[in-house]
Amino acid sequence: MLLLFCICCAFIKLVLAEVNLTFVDYAKLPPKYAELLANLTDQHGMVLFDTADVRFEAYNYLVNNITEINTDTDACLCQLLTGQYTTDCYIFDDSVYEGPENINPSTSILIKD
């Protein structure tokens, strides 16, 4: 019985070693993006499971390369939320966030009813 338990523990450890988890740290994002992300995820944290995922790449771009909010960073935020690669996503008008109701029609799927 103990041997079976050890084998199961070793298997679980092996499986978990292959999983890359990244917890999205809202504090590292620009405040407007952090607020929007927190609201759209009902204040629950986000976890990215695969480093090859477009969401992981978008998150890294937003955390490491952002100097200003623009259409490129809007597209990255959409990629982070949807998991789909897109460049046709504009959230902030002149970098002023006025609430999720002002998200353009191409991102209406991001707004929860």
From Swiss-Prot:
Glycans are attached at N20, N39, N65. Belongs to the UPF0321 family. InterPro entries: UPF0321 (IPR019445). This is UPF0321 protein C569.02c. It comes from the Eukaryota. The keyword Signal applies. Pfam families: DUF2430. The keyword Transferase does not apply. It comes from Schizosaccharomyces pombe (strain 972 / ATCC 24843). Keywords: Glycoprotein, Signal. Transmembrane segments: none annotated. Residues 1-17 form the signal peptide.
